[in-house]
Amino acid sequence: MIINAKGPASFAEKYIVRSIWENKFPPGSILPAERELSELIGVTRTTLREVLQRLARDGWLKIQHGKPTRVNNFWETSGLNILETIADLNPEGFPVLVDQLLSARTNVSAIYFRGALRNSPDTAVEVLAQIHQLEDTAESFAEYDYLLHHTLAFSSGNPLYVLILNGFKGLYSRVGRYYFSSPEARQLALNFYKELEVLAKAKNYVDVPALMRTYGINSGKMWLQLRDDMPTSIALQEANS
């Protein structure tokens, strides 16, 4: 097992998580005793305890006082905060993960875009006005797209959507820069922003779902044209930090 880590705690965390991912510590199984595991990994028991507590908070493990530490089925117990970790663990499966991520974001964004134009159309108009000064670069479009989603999610009346977006942020910023490296993708997005601005100025939230659905289909087709050429390094968090 080859693990790149910046210190003992990072190494221990990656060792345990990779062992869970590769089914060496399968869901429902009991982790080795603390002393045995610390010797196996090569870290102190104090460091190991800190790592185990952190992994338990993230949903990888279940720790109960007086009982052995049990491995969870992380798909059932973890949150969006492990997306980066999954991408690091499985770069070959990263395109599929991105497909799922974009599909989820498209479905959720249709709700908070409509809510934002209904509850705070002036905020939507204000943030959409920025498209007229938007630089035609991948970086600018990726940053603006996230800003737009974040602003409208917050003004939709349900701040939980912002927390969902925050869970996507790291992965989406990297994928977004790649996606928007395509001039055609930037033009497609710009056309969408302009149509959304028209709806916002008219305070027309009713037609937002149809617009979102059309853009979701078209941007999905664009993504399928780009995904196979996506560098695998995009999946790796540390390679992009």
Swiss-Prot record:
SMART domains: HTH_GNTR
Single GO biological process annotation from the record: fatty acid metabolic process
DNA-binding region in chain numbering: 34-53
Compartment(s): Cytoplasm
Alphabetical list of PROSITE patterns matching this protein: HTH_GNTR
Listed CDD domains: WHTH_GntR (cd07377)
Molecular function (Gene Ontology), one example: DNA binding
Function: Multifunctional regulator of fatty acid metabolism.
HAMAP family the record matches: HTH_FadR (MF_00696)
The name this protein goes by in its record: Fatty acid metabolism regulator protein
Source species: Shewanella sp. (strain MR-4)
